[in-house]
């Protein structure tokens, strides 16, 4: 770092060349000019990347010994903003895609009418594997096929239209993959994008929706439980995209805690500049990933049976 003409300034912890240019250990990284000790940054990155239930700003303040709650909040916001790799590999293979509303209920405005709810699109890789058949414990050759979730992607979206969902799929799912959705007509253009599309139309009233797209509903359930348990459900719509980043990062690395910490450090170091709070949580006026919650009826999906829930040639009817 010092170079042939540099020398260390003991009073400032930087190296200066003969031309007066100063370089520190954190120059060119996301930690440049931070007033917090590097050990505190590393400890915070470890907590956010490895703890299964996550950690709230108040918990972080207590564990790290930070005197001001606002400092803990800013630290957590900056870490979340760096947890998404710009060159991450898209989902591939067999992928379930669906949307759901995330957020707390409002008094007098239940369900999708609540303005605190945000529409989120989910993509989940499906991994199929063989497991011993519990019905034949004495036969070691008897096996059954089971499913588990692979990697996930999720983003806040302004609506569930074709104009929103098709670009999201093209950006997050590798061409040639098999995409499984429900009967919502906004997905009808997937074949034109090069995907093998399987539509599952719910045909049995009273059957749990999780039986049709099980991995997506598992992820949605885990996300809601995490937001409710760790953050008591107190997540503002403008903050939700950053919380989705944190959940996605940790879920995709749930089997590799050590590498997750090193990956988080790498993303933090290579973040050239931290976004300011208003930039990170700016509420855009639409587009993929915008922090806009659908408060108008035009942005909600019709009830089942009113948007083409009839089986076509490519439909798979689950009974």
Question: How does the language model describe each region?
Answer:
Residues 1-319:
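Residue-level recognition of single "structural anchor" positions
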């Amino acid at each position: 770092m010092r170079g042939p003409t540099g020398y260390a300034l003991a009073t400032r912890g930087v190296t200066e060349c003969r031309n007066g240019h100063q370089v520190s250990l954190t120059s060119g990284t996301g930690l440049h000019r931070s007033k917090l000790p590097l050990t505190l940054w590393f400890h915070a990155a470890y907590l956010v990347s490895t703890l299964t239930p996550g950690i709230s700003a108040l918990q972080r303040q207590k564990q790290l010994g930070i005197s001001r709650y606002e400092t803990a909040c800013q630290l957590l916001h900056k870490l979340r903003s760096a947890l998404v790799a710009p060159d991450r590999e898209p989902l591939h293979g067999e992928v379930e895609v669906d949307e759901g509303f995330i957020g707390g209920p409002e008094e007098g405005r239940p369900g999708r009418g609540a303005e605190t709810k945000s529409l989120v699109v989910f993509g989940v890789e499906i991994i199929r594997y063989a497991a011993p058949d519990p019905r034949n414990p004495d036969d070691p050759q008897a096996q059954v096929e089971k499913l588990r979730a692979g990697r996930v992607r999720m983003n806040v979206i302004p609506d569930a239209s074709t104009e929103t969902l098709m670009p999201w799929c093209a950006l997050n799912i590798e061409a040639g993959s098999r995409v499984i959705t429900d009967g919502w007509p906004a997905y009808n253009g997937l074949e034109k994008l090069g995907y093998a599309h399987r539509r599952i139309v719910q045909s049995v009233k009273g059957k749990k929706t999780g039986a049709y797209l099980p991995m997506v509903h598992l992820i949605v359930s885990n996300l809601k439980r995490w937001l409710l348990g760790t953050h008591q459900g107190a997540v503002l719509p403008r903050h939700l995209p950053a919380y989705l980043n944190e959940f996605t990062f940790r879920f995709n690395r749930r089997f590799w805690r050590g590498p997750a910490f090193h990956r988080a450090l790498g993303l933090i170091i290579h973040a050239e500049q931290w976004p300011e709070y208003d930039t990170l949580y700016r509420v855009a006026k639409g587009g993929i990933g915008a922090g806009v919650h659908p408060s108008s009826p035009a942005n909600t999906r019709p009830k089942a049976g009113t948007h083409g829930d009839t089986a076509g040639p490519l439909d798979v009817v689950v009974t």
